[in-house]
Amino acid sequence: MKKHIRVLLALMVSGVVLASCTTREVSCTLKGRIHDRNSDTLILKRATDDPRFNQVLIPVRDSAFEFTIQIYHPEAYELIFKEELERGSWRPVLFIAEKGEISFELYSNPDENKITGRNLNSVLAEYNKEFLGMFRPKADPLNDSIDALFQKNEYFSAEMKLLQSELANAGDNESRMALREKMEDLRSTGNDLSPRAKDLTRQGDSLRAEATRWRYKYIEENPSIVSYYFLLNDLRYLESSQANIEEIKSLYPVFAGKYPEHAYTEIMRSMLEGHDAIKVGGSFIDFSLPDLDGTVHRLSDIIGGKYALIDLWASWCGPCIATSRSMIPVYEEFRDRGFTVCGVAAEIDNTDQMRARIEKEKFPWINLVELDHKNHIWDKYGVSNSGGGTFLMDNEGTILAINPDAEKVREILSEKLKQTF
């Protein structure tokens, strides 16, 4: 949680990409040395990917590494120290994958890192220098205050500290899942923090708003892939970025027209489509996915004019599984009255854990597979940065509720279906 404020800089100092796209692959070679830390593995990923997906492991030998990737167009990538990712708190090394060689000097203090390459990484360095010169003097005092709260064990609220203690002593997975769900409830209401931590969070929000205004001035004055990446990053982290969705929407056609073949164009199209459609009163977005046997199903065919719950989940997401489990009695109660559930699991590399979880939980409805986020379903449904979500629809495909609990689903179905059956 120390990154709660420190992530301020990580989010504000986004990656910079500046070049035209190419339709053929070119080589990008990464060469680097690591100083003042014992690390044996780096994780390479696109900056737009979840670190749990599409990882490439780069071995570190004698404090040095070298790796070559093939790219179709300049794009922001990240290097993450494996041990940091495993701890659950990491600061990625952001760079621009471009044709040629990129050199890295990586230190235990990330602020000392040096990245040199061709034009794009020079632009990145200049942008970050200007940005940090403006905002670091304002951000550092917030970081120091947060550190002081942690040292005095005064960052979290009493309720949150109690749950953390119980989680540390929980003996089984089911208990841990229940405790994590309670902790998430506290976070959603802001009651996970002490009063002083809440005040510092408000100051951080104000600073981020100022940084966002500065960044959008840069975007407007520099309509390049630099700005395109900023738009995408803000859309992915819309709640925390404090970006204006209408401003993003108005700028997107400019960039999509200029870079129609860039990967960012399709990602943003899917996310903006979901933002417009996926809301109470909006309509579901149709898709086709395979089940565990490989048979492809279209969502609209599964729903077939019924009231339906779309359940996006993952075998590694405890709160998602708890939500899915809670819906089983509701499904059994209303399945013969015009209600169905369609599960979609976001899985990594393979479906082994999904298959095992379904067998354990005995989910009685169909479950489809979104493997490695290939179809952008989470983007389309506005849950890019979470394990999943649920969406209740009526028999015409209109969304009635987003992330309702089981009792809310039962309440809505009881009202809507009482005169039908």
Residue ranges and their predicted role:
Residues 1-32, 419-421:
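Bacterial Sec-dependent N-terminal signal peptides
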Residues 21-201:
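A non-transmembrane, solvent-exposed segment enriched in polar/low-complexity residues
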Residues 203-210, 242-248:
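Helix-turn-helix repeat elements of alpha-solenoid scaffolds
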Residues 221-237:
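Amphipathic alpha-helical repeat scaffolds of TPR domains
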Residues 245-290, 295-306, 332, 349-359, ...:
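N-proximal helix/coil linker or "cap" segments that precede and/or mark the start of modular domains
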Residues 307-308, 312-329:
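Conserved redox-active cysteine motifs that mediate thiol-disulfide chemistry
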Residues 322-361, 370-379:
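Structural microenvironment flanking redox-active thiols in thiol-disulfide oxidoreductases
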Residues 363, 370-418:
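Thiol/disulfide oxidoreductase modules built on the thioredoxin-like
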